[in-house]
């Protein structure tokens, strides 16, 4: 159930944007216009940051009310809500990585490179297994979710490192500035979520 909620912003924004930019990235790659490819990639990552950071804040701060609203009925008890909320929290930590992978993989596909994303995915899979075995003891099912989030972070770290080498660098300065603005823009979302989470209606 936690992954279902993560898939909502991921599918609407991450996958949709990755699909939309692939033709543009492919056109730049075919022409050898790597400056334009870097610019398009950077723009896409900045857009994702502005969307995913507030979404992450909302999912983390409102995880219990959201699960209570959508799933807590019938055989799904209040205890199940608490358990699912723990998994959702762990998944949400890696939401930026799940979304970023879609964008970065599109850049590799535009350069006719499917091998590098596949290798990175295999490495991340083994890391996921090792982390899951290590974390599911102390954290139970939330450990499995956290393992998936951490392995996604490793996946995107590998992809970004290779892509930076391939493209001769990425505009980290603009990305950093955009990330900072996204953090600032997330503050009102955080305040609103804290207010909503404090409402007594969720305790009924």
Regions found by a protein language model. Give the residues of each.
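Membrane-embedded alpha-helical bundles of multi-pass transporters/translocases
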Residues: 1-204
């Amino acid at each position: 159930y936690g992954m279902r909620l993560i898939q909502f912003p991921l599918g609407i924004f991450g996958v949709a944007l990755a699909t939309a930019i692939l033709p543009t990235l492919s056109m730049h790659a075919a022409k050898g216009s790597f400056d334009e490819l870097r610019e398009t990639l950077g723009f896409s990552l900045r857009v994702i940051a502005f969307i995913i950071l507030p979404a992450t804040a909302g999912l983390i701060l409102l995880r219990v009310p959201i699960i209570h609203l959508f799933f807590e009925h019938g055989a799904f008890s209040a205890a199940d809500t608490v358990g699912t909320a723990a998994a959702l929290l762990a998944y949400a930590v890696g939401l930026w990585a799940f979304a970023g992978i879609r964008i970065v993989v599109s850049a590799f596909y535009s350069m006719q490179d499917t091998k590098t994303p596949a290798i990175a995915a295999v490495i991340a899979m083994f890391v996921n297994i090792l982390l899951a075995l290590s974390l599911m003891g102390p954290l139970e099912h939330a450990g499995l979710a956290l393992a998936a989030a951490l392995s996604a972070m490793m996946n995107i770290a590998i992809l970004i490192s290779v892509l930076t080498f391939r493209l001769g660098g990425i505009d980290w300065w603009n990305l950093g500035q955009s990330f900072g603005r996204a953090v600032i823009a997330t503050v009102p979302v955080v305040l609103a979520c804290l207010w909503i989470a404090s409402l007594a209606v969720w305790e009924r």
